[in-house]
């Protein structure tokens, strides 16, 4: 359906999806990915709204998945007086992880956040003031805390690239029967080795007695909230494209240029090119080729 010269500006998540990448290359369209656009501080302004929604939703989904009727351990996330709360482990302390932690702490769960960025850990420690444990992420730390968890949230992101498989099938096999995982990273291939994408209609499946919730596009379940949040973030970029054309709009804004993944059959996102061993072309050079 796409043709040469058309602009596709949306979430693409190409790194784990070769068929889509191949079709976009063949289309010769201008393909700009929300999830790799950056701002002047290196943040991901068009991914952030959906990450906030998905992070908060992950705890709602996880709490429901822990119910006995959904195959879970039959735990109330926050416990009650005299009964300990569920142990929630969040792998990744970025926007998704921080929002998941806020929800879990608000429900009085026992929360642990794992991340490899010390500055991120300091910020989270300052925010939660002991209400959530913040741990430097190593293979040993992941194994220890995942095996102790009732609910694990996968919140890992490498911009533009496929998510790393940080929780292995061996870890899953050793988890508590009826424990649950929510893989928010599933749009980028997932960070659990046993993950595969599910739908809102059939959100869960079970591997080794662990309930997996791996719904792609989690924010679609709360479409009204998600739409307003996304519109607020994307509108300034859409206005730039409409008023200036894609060449000028992208070349004037280095962060916007980071969003260019494919143009005229050329791959201009390093992470996507590396995922499929494709030729990478610098985005400025690619635009200049066809000016």
At which residue positions do the language-model features occur?
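Adenosine-phosphate binding glycine-rich loop
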Residues: 35-76, 186, 191-291
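Rossmann-like adenosine-cofactor binding region
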Residues: 126-209
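An N-terminal-biased, well-structured beta-alpha scaffold segment characteristic
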Residues: 1-23
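A short helix->loop->beta-strand "cap" motif at the edges of active sites that frequently abuts
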Residues: 3-7, 27-29, 176-179, 210
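Glycine-rich phosphate/diphosphate-binding loop of Rossmann-like nucleotide-binding domains
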Residues: 69-157, 204
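Generic hydrophobic/aromatic pocket-lining and core-packing "Φ" positions
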Residues: 21, 59, 100-101, 121, ...
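Short, ordered loop/turn segments at secondary-structure junctions
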Residues: 13-14, 29, 36-39, 116-118, ...
């Amino acid at each position: 359906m796409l043709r040469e010269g058309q602009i596709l500006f949306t979430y693409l998540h190409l790194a784990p999806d070769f068929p889509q990448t191949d079709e976009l290359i063949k289309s010769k369209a201008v393909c700009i990915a929300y999830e790799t656009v950056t701002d002047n501080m290196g943040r991901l302004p068009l991914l952030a709204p959906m990450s906030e929604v998905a992070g908060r939703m992950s705890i709602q989904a996880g709490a429901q998945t822990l119910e006995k009727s959904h195959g879970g351990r039959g735990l109330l996330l926050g416990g009650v007086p005299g009964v300990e709360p569920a142990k929630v482990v969040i792998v990744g302390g970025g926007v998704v992880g921080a929002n998941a932690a806020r929800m879990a702490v608000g429900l009085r769960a026992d929360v642990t956040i794992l991340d490899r960025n010390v500055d991120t850990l300091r910020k989270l420690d300052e925010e939660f003031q002991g209400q959530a444990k913040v741990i430097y992420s190593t293979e040993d730390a992941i194994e220890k805390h995942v095996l102790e968890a009732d609910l694990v949230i996968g919140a890992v992101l490498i911009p533009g690239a496929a998510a790393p498989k940080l929780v292995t099938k061996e870890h899953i096999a050793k988890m508590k029967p009826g424990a649950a995982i929510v893989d928010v990273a599933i749009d980028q291939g997932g960070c659990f080795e046993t993950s595969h994408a599910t739908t809102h209609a059939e959100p869960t499946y079970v591997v080794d007695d662990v309930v997996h919730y791996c719904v792609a596009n989690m924010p679609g379940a709360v479409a009204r909230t998600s739409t307003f949040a996304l519109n607020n973030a994307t509108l300034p970029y859409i206005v730039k494209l409409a008023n200036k054309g894609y060449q000028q709009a992208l070349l004037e804004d280095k962060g916007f240029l980071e969003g260019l993944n494919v143009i005229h059959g050329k791959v201009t996102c390093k992470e996507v090119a590396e995922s499929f061993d494709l030729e990478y072309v610098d985005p400025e050079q690619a635009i200049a080729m066809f000016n």
